[in-house]
């Protein structure tokens, strides 16, 4: 049971935050410089509700679920593989607003990503120190779980290997995405932190109108992929309007963010 003294703080937090909330870990091992530990512990997301007591119940379950994930079989196996022990671990839990837009009974962002300041597999004109980014439609769990994302070097945003050939673009780009189910109020709370997430086909996002700046359209008659959304034809997640036509300065942001992060911690991030 969580301390009663936290209830008032949580209600004050609910009054300020009007979006879904992510409940995630922040531990000593996750901040380690010498081995990756991100994604080992659970991260839960809960919808925003008008009933603050229902939100408090969901939040309480999620916080306990995050702490409990330290003792899961997979977590302990990873600790052993990296020569760590549970006794050395210390953890805080962070509450963050989930970035995105509500579409009916689901909530998700148009863009999520994971950036690395070192590119271990540079190709063509890329340099290792230029870093690399994995981009996807929907919640970032799709990336963390190893989904088919778009690999981009922010210094060469117009040169994406996966979209360099039509057959490759159709075969090796994202076809599904994660969204938060706003109807699920945690009555079926599970140790699986994805219990209230929906894994949907990209065509569902097309119906939501969330692909305008991130998708291209495959024309089966002319056998080409055209940047932008057009009637008919399969929608391909290329981020072309953003990466190549600079509708939004994402490439510049992705050049600066890892650079600043690496400068602050004095190590690759």
Question: What is each of the regions a protein language model found here?
Answer:
Residues 1-269:
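Conserved mixed alpha/beta core segments that line enzyme active sites in large multi-domain catalysts
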């Amino acid at each position: 049971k969580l301390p009663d003294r936290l209830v008032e703080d949580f209600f004050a937090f609910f009054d300020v935050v009007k979006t879904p909330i992510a409940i995630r870990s922040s531990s000593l091992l996750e901040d380690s410089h010498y081995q990756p530990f991100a994604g080992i512990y659970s991260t839960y997301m809960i919808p925003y509700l008008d009933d603050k007591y229902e939100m408090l119940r969901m939040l309480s379950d999620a916080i306990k679920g995050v702490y409990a994930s330290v003792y899961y079989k997979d977590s302990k196996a990873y600790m052993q593989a990296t020569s760590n022990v549970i006794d050395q671990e210390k953890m805080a839990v962070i509450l963050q607003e989930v970035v995105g837009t509500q579409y009916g009974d689901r909530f998700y962002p148009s863009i999520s990503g994971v950036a690395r300041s070192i590119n271990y597999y540079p190709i063509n004109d890329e340099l290792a120190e230029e870093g690399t980014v994995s981009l996807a439609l929907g919640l970032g769990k799709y990336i963390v779980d190893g989904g088919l994302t778009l690999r981009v070097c922010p210094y060469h945003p117009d040169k994406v290997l996966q979209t360099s050939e039509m057959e490759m673009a159709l075969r090796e780009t994202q076809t599904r995405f994660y969204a938060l189910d706003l109807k699920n109020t945690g009555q079926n709370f599970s140790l699986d932190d994805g219990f209230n997430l929906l894994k949907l086909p990209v065509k569902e996002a097309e119906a939501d109108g969330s692909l305008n700046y991130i998708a291209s359209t495959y024309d089966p008659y002319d056998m080409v992929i055209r940047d932008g959304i057009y009637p008919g034809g399969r929608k391909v997640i290329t981020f072309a309007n953003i990466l190549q036509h600079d509708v939004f300065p994402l490439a510049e942001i992705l050049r600066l963010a890892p650079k600043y992060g690496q400068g602050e911690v004095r190590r690759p991030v």
